Amino acid sequence: TIDLEHQLNQSMKNKEIFTLLGLEKSLVYFTTSLKANKIVIQKLMRNSTFLKMYEDDQDLLEDVLIENKQAIEMAEIYSHILSGMMNTFSSVI
């Protein structure tokens, strides 16, 4: 996003705005997918009685859930940053 920000500073054309829109759209899809994965991981952890899981498997699932939550947070942060950049540049244009 830093390179894109520099490009926007140099030339405020529609091309850069559409690039931002594409990035924002991708982040929405990415966040939605991560949230769906979180639900699946949580269900796997709850249904460990039906699935034979060893302690290492349970630990691995917990680690995966933590990483997934961090990825959701990062995607949401970048989405907010992109929204702010788009609002700023649209008000300038």
Where are these regions (language model features)?
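Membrane-associated alpha-helical segments
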Residues: 2-93
